[in-house]
């Protein structure tokens, strides 16, 4: 989704549980991320300020659009813990802000499967989890990471529904097979 001119928000999440309750929580997580990132505005509603739960490295511009957007992860965590903590619902989440001009991707991986950067030779990089899941720990610190995605590269994010799927013979698909699929495709 578009955040500001030249910045795109990229998000994928997987809520714990199954069924209607889990689906409703996923809708809540989605709405909170979009509202707190500034993608959606609510007339007359004051949003909370910075939580200081997204660490900003001193050498970076902490007032940049990406940092404000990434703060949405911490604000979502705070909201879920305070208002729904007794339900023990949480989500793994990958949220990134892509500067479409430079290819810079600033992201938080909150316990989600590693996103993959795929180039002409196959898998170039795994974007490993850097932070805890969202909605479980009241004082969680979310650590942003930064990479540059080269022109022509593919960013692939997925849920464990891909790697946990089974063949008709009950064979697990797994992470290794997923990596092999992309290495074979690009060679």
Label for each model-derived stretch:
Residues 1-16, 20-187:
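Conserved subregion of the PPM/PP2C metallophosphatase catalytic domain
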């Amino acid at each position: 989704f578009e955040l500001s001119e030249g910045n795109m928000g990229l998000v994928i999440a997987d809520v714990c549980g199954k069924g209607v309750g889990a689906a409703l929580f996923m809708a809540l997580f989605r709405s909170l991320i979009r509202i707190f990132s500034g993608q959606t505005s609510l007339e007359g509603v004051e949003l909370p300020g910075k939580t200081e739960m997204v660490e900003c490295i001193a050498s970076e511009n902490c007032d940049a659009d990406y940092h404000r957007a990434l703060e949405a992860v911490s604000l979502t965590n705070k909201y879920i813990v305070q208002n729904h903590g007794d339900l023990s619902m949480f989500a793994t989440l990958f949220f990134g802000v892509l500067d479409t001009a430079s290819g810079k991707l600033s992201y938080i991986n909150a316990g989600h499967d590693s996103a993959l950067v795929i180039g002409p030779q196959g898998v170039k990089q795994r974007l490993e989890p850097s932070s805890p899941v969202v909605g479980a720990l009241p004082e969680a610190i979310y650590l942003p990471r930064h990479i540059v995605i080269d022109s022509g590269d593919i960013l692939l994010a997925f849920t464990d529904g891909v790697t946990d799927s089974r063949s008709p013979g009950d064979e697990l698909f797994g992470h290794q097979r997923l990596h092999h699929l992309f290495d074979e495709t690009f060679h």
